[in-house]
UniProtKB/Swiss-Prot annotation:
Coiled coil: none annotated. Residues 346-562 are annotated as: B. One of its GO terms (molecular function) is ATP hydrolysis activity. GO terms for cellular component: cytoplasm. It is found in: Cytoplasm. Residues 563-637 are annotated as: C. NCBIfam families: PRK05218.1 (NF003555). This is Chaperone protein HtpG. It comes from Shewanella baltica (strain OS155 / ATCC BAA-1091). It comes from the Bacteria.
């Protein structure tokens, strides 16, 4: 006998449904993900309960989910042979937005059983995602172990109420039929549904099946009859999660094929790590380092992050909460049993659990790179060529791992004589001179400019190695990486060289004597250059060049000024310190000039030469050329 009743939803469902349908989900095709997830959840519940009551299987222990579409009627049906629901269960679980039978089910579990129970759907809104595409939803369900005439019919148009009736249903489980809106009829297509299943539910452990039509008898090419085939249910998903299998059972080829599947990359990955974490947070991660950088890696709007699965069900792409920006090249996934999600299952809750998992995964990736650098330097150079500049963002972004990231950086160096960035900070430290306490470096516009900078002259003479940096990000990097393993990084273009014990007593005495002898010359140049410079000094870093400019301690460097200007940032006026080399013939002859006008011209010429060498350009190149021509003409005979 029919027992139809009309119920109002237990919360302000009309408003909540409207909010969810229009705001909660970012793409409507995930309604199928949610419903398949619920169906797989029901199958897992039955599997668990049947451990102690095998009769619940009712002679059918092959658990599965079946999906079918009817183009003419504009419907999609998702059917499972899982645990099903009673009338009270339907009213309770389908009548309340924030209710989830799964969450209650977890409360009844204890011990190791709860660890193994493959349950998903912590939030009750998943079912209501059906209304994103459906104008009406019909649910037919019978709880396992109940009589056929105790089945339930639930119907709603998502407008704030629903009807419940008693029906007869021979098979246990739940059948959900979506009556699609006119503008959503694209989903009543088998191929469309198959593509969604492959995308979102490929690795659910329960088989997801679709009906494959049979073929009539036909004539073959050689005249023989090709027999007819009957229609059958065909499994659409792989029904196995590769990352949940033992590493020993997975071949390199399988890992590489899976990488291509999740990344859409055509080339093999450089390396990977497959790991299960147990403890306060339990999750599995499968992480890949690609061999090639994506073309849009530097696009700030490009999404990055890991694929997120909960119990092998795909939740989202680009879960950036688990991966810092400087590791945005990493591909892979994370699968958790108890990961906290917000109510939409789209955006992760930013809490201590998420942060702890992010910390663990970050350390895992850094460990992968450290091992690669140690075991295969050539392969690491391949990685560095593709992703090194991104990794250089790390010290500014990740203070906790700054030292580890610094150990992974690679630079060109005066030691190798090559432009290839192959030198690590540990390599540099291993070659430091006795008494050397600093790591010397220079940042310039190009490798050639850095390698040929006059600032290196004294250091080269003493055999002191200098790191050569010429990437745009290097100045930013060095502002956040001031020391490594208690060794300060020191710019050879800023302030004093601070050679310390590398300078012997005789050299110090000679330098002091030269400075005393040049006091008058320094004062004359100061007067000639006026406000063009912050100061004039006798250099301690030049041997073959007449003069150079340096930034004062605490002042903005030339490269940082360029970086800010390129970003459209206001830059304060910075006057350089002008260092002269009295031992150079040009400076020596300058000191002999009695004509103050000529002295000023030559002083300006040397200053602008030094600025051109340091900056690669001048604020007023025409004035420089005019002065140069004037000086050439005056000295031509």
């Amino acid at each position: 006998m029919s027992q139809q009743e009309t119920h109002g939803f237990q919360t302000e469902v009309k408003q909540l449904l409207h909010l969810m349908i229009h705001s909660l989900y970012s793409n409507k095709e995930i309604f199928l993900r949610e419903l398949v997830s619920n169906a797989a959840d029901a199958a897992d519940k039955l599997r668990y309960l049947a451990l102690t009551n095998d009769a619940l299987y009712e002679g059918d222990g092959e658990l599965r989910v079946r999906i079918s579409a009817d183009k003419e009627k504009g419907t999609v049906t998702i059917e499972d042979n899982g645990v099903g629901m009673t009338r009270d269960g339907v009213i309770e679980h389908l009548g309340t937005i924030a209710k989830s039978g799964t969450a209650d089910f977890f409360k009844n579990l204890s011990g190791e059983s709860s660890k193994d129970s493959q349950l998903i759907g912590q939030f009750g809104v998943g079912f209501y995602s059906a209304f994103i595409v459906a104008k009406k939803v019909t649910v037919r369900t019978r709880a396992a172990g109940h009589k056929a005439d105790e089945a339930v019919l639930w119907e709603s148009e998502g407008e704030g109420n629903f009807t419940v009736d008693t029906i007869t249903k021979a098979s246990r489980g739940t059948e959900i039929t979506l009556h699609l809106r006119d503008e959503e009829k694209e989903f009543a297509d088998d191929w469309r549904l198959r593509s969604i299943i492959t995308k979102y539910s490929d690795h659910i452990s329960v088989p997801v099946e679709m009906w494959q039509e049979g073929t009539p008898e036909s004539d073959g090419a050689d005249g023989e009859k090709i027999p007819a085939t009957e229609g059958q249910w065909k499994v659409m998903n792989k029904a196995t999660a590769l990352w949940m299998r033992s590493k020993a059972d997975i071949s390199d080829e399988e890992y590489q094929e899976f990488y291509k599947h999740i990344s859409h990359d055509y080339t093999d990955a450089l390396l990977w790590s497959h790991n299960r974490v147990e403890g306060k947070q339990e999750y599995t991660n499968l992480l890949y380092i690609p061999a090639k950088a994506p073309w849009d890696m530097w696009n700030r709007d490009r999404k990055h992050g890991l694929k997120l699965f909960v119990q092998r069900v795909f939740i989202m792409d680009d879960a950036e909460q688990f991966m810092p920006s400087y590791l945005r090249f990493v591909q892979g996934l994370i699968d958790s049993n108890d990961l906290p999600l917000n109510v939409s299952r789209e955006i992760l809750q930013d809490n201590h659990v998420t942060k702890a998992m992010r910390t663990g995964i970050t350390k895992r990736v850094l460990g992968m790179l450290e091992k690669l650098a140690k075991d295969d330097a050539e392969k690491y150079q391949q990685f560095w060529a593709e992703f090194g500049q991104v990794l250089k963002e790390g010290p500014a972004e990740d203070f906790a791992n700054r030292e580890r990231i610094a150990g992974l950086l690679r630079f060109a160096s005066t030691h190798t004589g090559s432009a290839a960035p192959t030198v690590s900070l540990d390599d540099y430290i291993s070659r430091m001179k006795e008494g050397q306490t600093k790591i010397y470096y220079i940042v310039a516009d190009s490798h050639e400019a850095a390698a040929n900078s006059p600032h290196l002259e004294l250091l080269r003479k003493k055999g002191i190695e200098v790191l050569l940096m010429s990437e745009r990000i290097d100045e930013w990097l060095i502002n956040h990486l001031t020391e490594y393993k208690e060794k300060q990084l020191h710019s050879v273009t800023r302030g004093d060289l601070e050679l310390g014990e590398l300078e012997d007593a005789a050299e110090k005495e000679a330098q002091e004597k030269l400075e005393q002898e040049s006091v008058a010359l320094v004062e004359r140049i100061k007067a000639a250059l006026g406000s063009s410079v912050a100061d004039v000094k006798v250099t301690s870093r030049l041997t073959d060049t007449p003069a150079c400019v340096v930034a004062g301690d605490g002042e903005m460097s030339t490269q940082m000024i360029k970086l800010m200007q390129a970003a459209g940032q206001p830059v304060p006026e910075v006057k350089p310190t002008f260092e002269i080399n009295p031992a150079h013939p040009l400076v020596s002859r300058l000191n002999d000039l009695q004509d103050e006008t000529a002295f000023a011209d030559w002083s300006n010429l040397l200053l602008q030469q030094a600025q051109l060498s340091e900056k690669g350009s001048l604020a007023d190149p025409s004035a420089f050329i005019k002065l140069m021509n004037q000086m050439l003409l005056a000295n031509m005979k």
